[in-house]
Amino acid sequence: MNYALETNDKEIFDLIHEELDRQNTHLEMIASENFTFPAVMEAMGSVLTNKYAEGYPYKRYYGGCEFVDRVEEIAIERAKKLFGCGFANVQPHAGSQANVAVYNALLKPYDKILGMDLSHGGHLTHGAKVSVTGQTYQSFFYGVELDGYINYDKVEEIAKIVKPQMIVCGFSAYARELDFKRFREIADSVGALLLGDVAHVAGLIVAGEYPNPFPHCHIVTTTTHKTLRGPRGGMILTNDEEIAKKIDKAVFPGMQGGPLMHVIAAKAVGFGENLKPEWKEYAKQVKANAKVLAKVLMARGYTLVSGGTDNHLILVSLLDKEFSGKDADRALGEAGITVNKNTVPGETRSPFVTSGVRIGSAALTARGMREKEFEFIATKIADVLDDVNNAAKHAEIKKEIAEFAKGFPVYTKAIF
């Protein structure tokens, strides 16, 4: 058997190395992306990928699970310690699957969900009509006010009209802190369960740099990458034993078969990193760097939804500009800066064009960049957007960015 990727499949090997070069020479500023730890990638590339383990630790449907049982047990214990909760399911393959599993466990088809409007910063799985969640359940939405903040009195007003079975508090593009306590008061007032989707800010929560959804949320879901810097995957947490039992059944056998044991091992490794004292410093720096981005871009005349940030991301509104989010995304890409176009409150363009861009600080902070570097980066972003159709200028800035990025290498090899 030929074990070497380079000789076994040169085409894929070369593409992986081209991606390594892109990650090293470009500035990754998509808010949902990050650079995971080499040890996490080692675990993902391990022999655990060969093991089927349907079921849960010590309650499997296959034999030979004595070692993967312990692996999953460690992942669960570390997850509970990180969030200070009683139960954790680490098997969901992704955050979206974690959310769907929660709905399947606790709701009936056509029950009512109240979540954040996608164009105001919510997520597809919070009831958007294009998502299975918006097709299986009756979905209703709250949003932000003209100042870019959630108006909790308005959320309560909507909840009392809708009377949902579940309220979802979470986001994919909201730069401010969520008031989980207030959300719980609203949920209790209408007899609803409260789901906290903290996929974007989980890494800040476990460092004490963002409010903890517990004890306010009945259920919490998150991804394990993004600000946690673990492998791509999902997780469901709760303090309620009866809810935990329903969640476990909804994940397996309800939605998934065999768990990805190599990824669960990688989750455990990532959680181990999150538990280290230095994690708190990383999370603090993520927030500090995002504030620099906000300050510089606003000083250069760009409008930020909510006028700043409390977390790892900023949302730039281009409603007052002649160019779109798609134009900005393309122009910054030409300059070696990767962001994503994003809808904004008051959106006038289609989701494929948009009137905003979402920019995050987590990945570049993982490369060791601090306030000084982020001031330089924010200046370059503004330079590009000030001349959004000048491809020649973007090419020059790309050279500057590539030279700058050399000082902060991501990885020295592509395969672990």
UniProtKB/Swiss-Prot annotation:
Residues that coordinate or bind (6S)-5,6,7,8-tetrahydrofolate: 118, 122-124, 242, 350-352
Membrane spanning stretches: none
Protein's UniProt name: Serine hydroxymethyltransferase
Marked site positions, Plays an important role in substrate specificity: 225
Location(s) in or outside the cell: Cytoplasm
HAMAP family per the UniProt record, alphabetical: SHMT
Chemical reaction(s) catalysed: (6R)-5,10-methylene-5,6,7,8-tetrahydrofolate + glycine + H2O = (6S)-5,6,7,8-tetrahydrofolate + L-serine
Entry function: Catalyzes the reversible interconversion of serine and glycine with tetrahydrofolate (THF) serving as the one-carbon carrier. This reaction serves as the major source of one-carbon groups required for the biosynthesis of purines, thymidylate, methionine, and other important biomolecules. Also exhibits THF-independent aldolase activity toward beta-hydroxyamino acids, producing glycine and aldehydes, via a retro-aldol mechanism.
Pfam name, any one: SHMT
GO molecular function: glycine hydroxymethyltransferase activity; pyridoxal phosphate binding
N6-(pyridoxal phosphate)lysine: modified positions: 226
Source organism, top-level taxon: Bacteria
Gene symbol of the encoding locus: glyA
InterPro entries membership: PyrdxlP-dep_Trfase, PyrdxlP-dep_Trfase_major, PyrdxlP-dep_Trfase_small, Ser_HO-MeTrfase, Ser_HO-MeTrfase-like, Ser_HO-MeTrfase_PLP_BS, SHMT-like_dom
Subunit structure: Homodimer.
